[in-house]
Amino acid sequence: MLHTLHRSPWLTDFAALLRLLSEGDELLLLQDGVTAAVDGNRYLESLRNAPIKVYALNEDLIARGLTGQISNDIIPIDYTDFVRLTVKHSSQMAW
């Protein structure tokens, strides 16, 4: 399943998101959700421990001035890669 987090993790039921993640799922951070990718924040450690790959939309990182602050564990992607993820996963959960 593809999970997309478009809101700040501080304004989301992040614990519920983590509970619903399964091995093989992927999480895309976009819009204000990219703030979860900032190195050193409290949500990042939980994402590191999850059995998933985590991506962040590069355009949203740039728009928020965060490109130099994200963790190396987060994979920046562009819109083409976003489309590939949506094609790969038949189901999606938006947060």
From Swiss-Prot:
GO terms for cellular component: sulfurtransferase complex. It is found in: Cytoplasm. Keywords: Cytoplasm, tRNA processing. Gene3D superfamilies: DsrEFH-like (3.40.1260.10). InterPro entries: DsrEFH-like, Sulphur_relay_TusB, Sulphur_relay_TusB/DsrH. GO terms for biological process: tRNA wobble position uridine thiolation. The keyword tRNA processing applies. Its main location: cytoplasm. It comes from the Bacteria. Heterohexamer, formed by a dimer of trimers. The hexameric TusBCD complex contains 2 copies each of TusB, TusC and TusD. The TusBCD complex interacts with TusE. Belongs to the DsrH/TusB family. Part of a sulfur-relay system required for 2-thiolation of 5-methylaminomethyl-2-thiouridine (mnm(5)s(2)U) at tRNA wobble positions. This is Protein TusB. It comes from Escherichia coli O139:H28 (strain E24377A / ETEC).
